[in-house]
């Protein structure tokens, strides 16, 4: 598609009340700017991002996902404002679509409407029940007549619900004509892109209004806005995967990050959270389980289990209240109340209730290796570094500090002693 896209991402976003640049705040595990670029690249091979505030931090974050984006650093000293942001761009194509980096819900399909409008100047417009807080868009004879800031609006203009959504399509020649003529004679001393509307109308050009969906063009300016946008985004993610065949019970209670991938027939129960770039294949994730940056293949997890980052679980049963961290489990049963951290457990092994791998010595983490067909009895502690070889047994209640060889039974608890008649003697002596 012969279209250049410019994404404005230079602002600090002071209303977010954060040291993090606004466009790097995340929803569903990805930065806001990531979503805008992803949709832009569906339409164009010429995408530029205008930066200023913490520009190197923004570039470093986005380069993880996209390698072919052009970055333009705005001259914020001499040319501040949205109009100034466009003064340093070098578009490849005749049509230029201007987007905002704080609109993570924008979708490529709706952006195609700007091209279908058939005008050299198209401006996005929202039709709201209450336009309070926005500049009003006055439309006359099928063209945008002017944009009036709320403080300057008449009573009649304030009653309008038509407001500027902040996305524009320009012809390159039109932009080249008007950008040099922008002035900053306003209270903020900034160059406003919206002033191009008035210039174009004075030259009797049509500024075509394009009415768009509020949900898709919602700007994120505060933490409250971010929460609303994330709720919408996670709903889209859930619906996308359900269309692909993933079954979800009470989907509105399930949280899934953008980077998560499902393969085959999966069943996700209510209250589940799956984050990072987790990979779930042919598996059943039961209620209220949490999976972070892990791989689950042909397994069942939960209910109320927790897979922390860097777990790989294959053909394994992970039961309730089992926590696994940075571990590889293949063909394993760990049914209840266990902590398995920094360990490798091979097929056929059974981890009893209350088993803990003691992986941290106060300075660094150590590995626990458990071989094939190992039975680890309940309430055992495996003090790493330690290796339990194939076909061995750990007696319940043991604390294992030494390696266990294949075929051995390991016990480390005091011998039980039963004292006859003790109950009667004990309680009679207290009377």
Curated annotation (Swiss-Prot):
Mg(2+) binds at residues 102, 221. This is Bifunctional protein GlmU. GO terms for molecular function: glucosamine-1-phosphate N-acetyltransferase activity; magnesium ion binding; UDP-N-acetylglucosamine diphosphorylase activity. HAMAP family: GlmU (MF_01631). Pathway: Nucleotide-sugar biosynthesis; UDP-N-acetyl-alpha-D-glucosamine biosynthesis; N-acetyl-alpha-D-glucosamine 1-phosphate from alpha-D-glucosamine 6-phosphate (route II): step 2/2; Nucleotide-sugar biosynthesis; UDP-N-acetyl-alpha-D-glucosamine biosynthesis; UDP-N-acetyl-alpha-D-glucosamine from N-acetyl-alpha-D-glucosamine 1-phosphate: step 1/1; Bacterial outer membrane biogenesis; LPS lipid A biosynthesis. It comes from Wolinella succinogenes (strain ATCC 29543 / DSM 1740 / CCUG 13145 / JCM 31913 / LMG 7466 / NCTC 11488 / FDC 602W) (Vibrio succinogenes). Pfam families: Hexapep, NTP_transf_3. Coiled coil: none annotated. Residues 224-244 are annotated as: Linker.
